[in-house]
From Swiss-Prot:
Spans annotated as Required for interaction with MCOLN1: 41-71
Assembly: Homodimer. Interacts with MCOLN1. Interacts with SLC30A1, SLC30A2, SLC30A3 and SLC30A4.
Cited SUPFAM superfamilies: Cation efflux protein transmembrane domain-like (SSF161111)
Substrates-to-products reaction catalysed: Zn(2+)(in) = Zn(2+)(out)
A GO-annotated cellular component: late endosome membrane
Entry's transmembrane regions: 88-108, 116-136, 150-170, 187-207, 217-237, 255-275
Function: Zinc ion transporter that mediates zinc efflux and plays a crucial role in intracellular zinc homeostasis. Binds the divalent cations Zn(2+), Ni(2+), and to a minor extent Cu(2+). Is a functional modulator of P2X purinoceptors, including P2RX1, P2RX3, P2RX4 and P2RX7. Plays a role in central nervous system development and is required for myelination, and survival and proliferation of oligodendrocytes.
Chain segments carrying region Disordered: 1-64
Compartments, record wording: Cytoplasmic vesicle, Secretory vesicle, Synaptic vesicle membrane; Early endosome membrane; Late endosome membrane; Lysosome membrane
Ranges annotated as biased composition (Low complexity): 25-42
Source domain of life: Eukaryota
Stated name of the protein: Transmembrane protein 163
Keyword annotations of the record: Cell membrane, Cytoplasmic vesicle, Endosome, Lysosome, Membrane, Phosphoprotein, Synapse, Transmembrane, Transmembrane helix, Transport, Zinc
Length: 288
């Protein structure tokens, strides 16, 4: 009977009976380890946000590398064609208006010895040419988002800007050196008012369309119209100042020099920006 008792003493306790802790030690209550999931999720979210930010910064560059403008992602096909037609209508209107103003301004320049009128006439001719380039730019309905076609138009505009600015500055400097005095009459007043108002309205329309179509050519054409509006008002300003104070005879020529230098600087900036892009996108002919 005793061996049986010994065997009962050696039998281990059941799993449901806990063992007492050793003396001198407090019972350990192990707290569950914090889950690393929130930290890892926050790290992942930061890592996901980082490439998104960099991708958004390089988004337009990626489109240009594929031969497309940013308007290809902003506008639906029917919206792009609608704005393209509006750009064509505005360009035709600009050609008609500025051509008439150019003839009138050249007449004023010859009859009244006005450097500003000559400068405006040259700028009006430039506006006619730039609007014709915009017509070519949007003549192809399938190329409304073509980056290469856009940049070629801008390069041509840059060259025209340089040539016209040289002519304006040379004419203005010649008038300043020979001390040509402008004459004031109702014809000069009418031309300056009409050119200032009409060119300013055309500039606003071109800026709005250029922003929607993300077209640097349209924005450049709008800048040229804005310069034409400023020159139209400058004719009125210089004529009125000379009428009340003949000592300020140089104001007309000085404005002509300033406007010529402004056009020259814009043309140089345009060529610096656009010539490399023409080379980058010349192999792409991706149209809608």
């Amino acid at each position: 009977m005793e061996p049986a008792l010994g065997s009962e003493r050696r039998s281990p306790p059941g799993p449901g009976v806990p063992r007492p802790p050793p003396r001198g030690h407090a019972p350990s209550t192990a707290a569950p380890a914090p889950s690393p999931a929130p930290m890892s999720s926050s790290v992942q979210s930061d890592e996901e946000r980082q490439p998104r930010i960099s991708e958004s910064g390089q988004f337009s560059d990626g489109l240009e590398d594929r031969g497309l403008l940013e308007s290809s992602t902003r506008l639906k096909p029917h919206e792009a064609q609608n704005y393209r037609k509006k750009a064509l209508w505005v360009s035709w209107l600009s050609i008609i208006v500025t051509l008439a103003l150019a003839v009138a301004a050249f007449t004023v320049s010859v009859m009244r010895y006005s450097a500003s009128a000559f400068g405006f006439a040259f700028d009006a001719i430039l506006d006619v040419l730039s609007s014709a380039i915009v017509l070519w730019r949007y003549s192809n309905a399938a190329a409304v988002h073509s980056a290469n076609r856009e940049y070629i138009a801008c390069v041509i505009l840059g060259v025209i800007f340089l040539l016209s600015s040289i002519c304006i500055v040379v004419k203005a400097i010649h008038d300043l050196s020979t001390r040509l005095l402008p004459e004031v009459d109702d014809f000069l007043f009418s031309v300056s008012i009409l050119s200032g108002i009409l060119c300013s309205v055309l500039a606003v329309l071109k800026f709005m369309l250029g922003k929607v179509l993300t077209s640097r050519a349209l924005i450049t054409d709008g800048f040229n119209s804005l310069v034409g509006g400023v020159m139209g008002f400058s004719i009125l300003l210089s004529a009125e100042v000379f009428k009340h104070n003949a000592a300020v005879w140089y104001l007309d020529g000085s404005i002509g020099v300033l406007i010529g230098l402004t056009i020259f600087a814009y043309g140089v900036k345009l060529l610096i920006d656009m010539v490399p892009r023409v080379r980058q996108t010349r192999h792409y002919e991706m149209f809608e």
